[in-house]
């Protein structure tokens, strides 16, 4: 089974917050285990970029972006297509969730893999059976 990351999961790992070890374990599996992937929407990668830029500056954000885009991180990046955008927009229309998060949910649904997150907005979608979630600790 592979996994999908949202920005919460990647930021947890990058900032070495509680749950970072769990995210790193998935990344290690994607490096060493054939058929295991860590899917990330480019939209969520952009969210990580702007949050890193604000917290740690352009240099670190740029380095992360380049590492991810050049394949130096074991992330399977997924581009938004018109179909994916429409599916994400439909989720946003129905649920009180940030628009960027709808791309992570849509991707997890499409790939039929759990979403690794600690974002409390996702609880409702999990309760309604829209996706399986691997819960990371929520940050204080």
Region locations from a protein language model:
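Alpha-helix capping/helix-boundary segments
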Residues: 9-10, 44, 84, 104, ...
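Aromatic "clamp/platform" in nucleotide-sugar-dependent glycosyltransferases that forms part
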Residues: 96
């Amino acid at each position: 089974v592979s996994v999908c990351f949202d920005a919460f999961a990647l930021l947890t790992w990058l900032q070495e917050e509680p749950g970072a070890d769990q995210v790193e374990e998935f990344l290690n599996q994607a490096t060493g285990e054939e058929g295991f992937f860590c899917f990330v929407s480019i939209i969520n990668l952009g969210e990580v970029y702007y949050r890193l830029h604000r917290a740690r500056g352009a240099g670190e954000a740029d380095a992360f972006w380049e590492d991810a885009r050049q394949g130096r991180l074991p992330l399977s990046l997924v581009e938004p297509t018109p179909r994916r955008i429409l599916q994400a927009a439909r989720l946003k229309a129905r649920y009180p969730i940030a628009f960027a998060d709808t791309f992570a949910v849509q991707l997890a649904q499409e790939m039929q893999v759990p979403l690794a997150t600690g974002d409390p907005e996702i609880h409702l979608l999990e309760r309604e059976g829209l996706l399986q979630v691997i819960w990371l600790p929520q940050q204080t």
